[in-house]
Amino acid sequence: MAEAAKSRGEAPAALPTWPDEIYHVLKDAGIRQVAMVPDAGHSRLIRSFEADPETRVVTLTTEEEGVAMLAGAWLGGERGVLLLQSSGVGNCINMLSLPVICHMPLLMIVTMRGDWGEFNPWQIPMGQGTRPSLEAMGVIVNKVDEPDLVASTVQGAAHLAFNTWKPVAVLLGQRVLGAKNFKELARK
């Protein structure tokens, strides 16, 4: 996007601050383990945790492994977070019974696809099904569409998950992330 702005004679937009804010909120919440499937929407947050010697970052082969890993972390006395994209939520549905039935906290931060401004029709079904699927499994869901509300939403979700031993997901909408543009992606 910065290159497109530059070619139109506009100043590039400043980097958003919410990824750094999420990092600090999660550190303050005692997060020591990060389970993730690589995702561009989480890239700055992932890099921050990878650079943190106090945090263990585990790259998963599939998202549901993170649910089990974080249940184990909790049983071992540590807090963790699962970072994933909405398209990976479908992979977690059966495994979500673990924290629900066993009354374990689970904090998930989900970057959304398939909503506002989406260009890829293949992302729409799971993007639209993410919230109802999570709620059907007993997960408390908070969606945020304003960058200024990201940190406080994640903070509230972390408190809710770890104080009540419930699974909680924060959905970061495409208004926060920025909708991808196929024409711009094709030029890169």
Name each model feature, range by range.
Residues A2-K188:
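Thiamine diphosphate
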